[in-house]
From Swiss-Prot:
Domain of life of the native organism: Eukaryota
Signal peptide coordinates: 1-18
The name this protein goes by in its record: Conotoxin Cal6.39
Protein purpose: Probable neurotoxin.
Domain comment as written in the entry: The cysteine framework is VI/VII (C-C-CC-C-C).
Amino acid sequence: MSGTTVLLLTCLFLVTMATSDCDLYDDSCTGTEICCTPPGDYQGNCMEGEDCPSGGR
């Protein structure tokens, strides 16, 4: 792989890490919020259950 490809993948990984509040293995949501994850993904964002279209966990 070229250096540019590695750099792009690293940036993509960092952005992905920064935008997810929680994952199904480390649910850091507080109160009544659940970890709302897109179907097939284990990372998601904390939100109220009724606001989560995929059902979360």
